[in-house]
């Protein structure tokens, strides 16, 4: 059995497990929990009533958070020639072509987001087993396979978050830092929740979101009424 810290137990005692909170109430409750010496990341997890094995139920997308993420993402760009130069000028942290593909294949993963020009995808596609499980594989649907590398980089650096349902139907996403105001975190949550709702597959019957939780790095999750999305 996992031994929880005193702070964690104190935080857990604040949560009424028989209650489903609004997103704003959950955020306020998280912010009332014991503090730590670092700025915790705040995340949300939604359980979707989808079958990710079916292509038409693989929910994925991206959103520019209205209040940013609270961190500056390290962006890796697969590009060559003028597009590589453009990526560097736009603020990309790591830029390269074939050699960089091999470096990532060999285990280099010190980055948060990946952008690729279409001509590089023949090589980048081989990294599916490395990037896919980490949610880092470039995709046209999220604007990360593009010739407009400047826009892609600016969006990511400005607070864009990508999301994708996992094989168990869970969809997790960052909504900010504990230092954010309650309103800022609530607005970020609603921005992603609204986009997830918009992406509801037409083939899904019944309730779309069956469970929702908002949590932070060191604290237990607070149950949120899934009706806020569904």
UniProtKB/Swiss-Prot annotation:
This protein's record includes keyword NAD: no
PROSITE patterns for this protein: RIBOSOMAL_L1
Entry keyword set: Repressor, Ribonucleoprotein, Ribosomal protein, RNA-binding, rRNA-binding, Translation regulation, tRNA-binding
Signal peptide from the UniProt entry: none
Example of a GO MF term: structural constituent of ribosome
Matching CDD domains: Ribosomal_L1
Family, per entry: Belongs to the universal ribosomal protein uL1 family.
GO cellular component, one term: large ribosomal subunit
Oligomeric and partner information: Part of the 50S ribosomal subunit.
SUPFAM superfamilies: Ribosomal protein L1 (SSF56808)
Xref: InterPro entries: Ribosom_uL1_bac-type (IPR005878), Ribosomal_uL1 (IPR002143), Ribosomal_uL1-like (IPR023674), Ribosomal_uL1/biogenesis (IPR028364), Ribosomal_uL1_3-a/b-sand (IPR016095), Ribosomal_uL1_CS (IPR023673)
Record function comment: Binds directly to 23S rRNA. The L1 stalk is quite mobile in the ribosome, and is involved in E site tRNA release.
GO biological process: regulation of translation; translation
Pfam families: Ribosomal_L1
Protein name: Large ribosomal subunit protein uL1
Organism: Bifidobacterium adolescentis (strain ATCC 15703 / DSM 20083 / NCTC 11814 / E194a)
């Amino acid at each position: 059995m996992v031994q929880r810290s005193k702070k964690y137990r104190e935080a857990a005692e604040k949560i009424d497990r028989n209650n489903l909170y609004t997103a704003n109430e959950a955020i306020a409750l998280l912010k009332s929990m014991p503090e730590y010496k670092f700025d915790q990341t705040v995340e949300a997890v939604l359980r979707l009533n989808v079958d990710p094995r079916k292509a038409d139920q693989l929910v994925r997308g991206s959103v520019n958070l209205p209040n940013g993420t609270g961190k500056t993402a390290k962006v890796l760009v697969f590009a060559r020639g003028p597009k590589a130069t453009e990526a560097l000028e736009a603020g990309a942290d790591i830029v390269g072509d074939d050699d960089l593909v091999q470096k990532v294949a060999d285990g280099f993963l010190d980055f948060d987001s990946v952008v690729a020009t279409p001509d590089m995808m023949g090589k980048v596609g081989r990294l599916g087993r490395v990037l896919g499980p980490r949610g880092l594989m470039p995709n046209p649907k999220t604007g990360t396979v593009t010739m407009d590398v400047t826009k892609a980089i600016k969006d990511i650096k400005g607070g864009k978050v990508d999301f994708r349902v996992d094989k168990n139907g869970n969809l997790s996403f960052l909504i900010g830092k504990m230092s954010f105001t309650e309103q800022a975190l609530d607005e970020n949550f609603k921005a992603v929740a609204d986009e997830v709702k918009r992406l509801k597959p037409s083939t899904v019957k019944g309730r779309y979101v069956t469970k929702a939780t908002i949590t932070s790095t060191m604290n237990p999750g607070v149950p949120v009424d899934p009706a806020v999305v569904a």
